[in-house]
Amino acid sequence: AGDEPVKAPMPGNILDVKVKVGDTVKAGTVLCVLEAMKMENEIPAPKDGKVAQVVVTKGATVGAGDTLVVLA
């Protein structure tokens, strides 16, 4: 299947990262929380998989389309 990057839907700040490398996640599991325009947006896993890479850290600023987490 290959690795699938989970990207930021909008620019914002990472308030929290809920997963670590090696975690097994189900579709819909919250991977991280992105604050944009004073709203907290939970970023869900698009599919079942394993966390291959966590690109962002808490407090990081991201742009729209930036990779947050990579699922395998």
Residue spans of the language-model regions?
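Structured functional modules or segments
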Residues: A1-A72
